[in-house]
Amino acid sequence: NTMAESVIFIREHGINSIKQLDKYIQKSAEERQDLQDKMKEIDKDMQLLSDTMEQVHTVKKYRAYYKEYKANPSDKAFFEEHKAEITHYEIALSKLKKSYSKLPNSKDILDKLNKLQEKKNTLIQEYSSTKSTMDELYQIRKNYGIYMGKEMER
């Protein structure tokens, strides 16, 4: 940013003091942080959905073993042979039951994941565009200090 561009920016935004400029920079930094927080929230939601997807897959994969075991609970040999599959099924099902009344649909989960990814991509674009804005603001802040006769640290 040239000195002239900095002066134009300051005038266009009605900034009349270093204090106002600092407030503007602070507000921009907070907006940038807000975008980052939203992205973290989306990441959390996506992780939960991915975990759910994995549990649904496990339940479907081992359901037959579990049904066979429930149909013949006295068949100890079958239980011993398929103990791992039955246990995986029970754990996955119990996790799903904490959040869902019936087995969630994989397609619905994928749709939600896709929507969240789109939202996140938009936020990422906004976030990266705020990076250059912040760099510009810090340069304007520096130029303002020089313009006013003293170099100021950001």
Q: What kind of feature is each model-predicted range?
A:
Residues 1-154:
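Extended intrinsically disordered terminal tails
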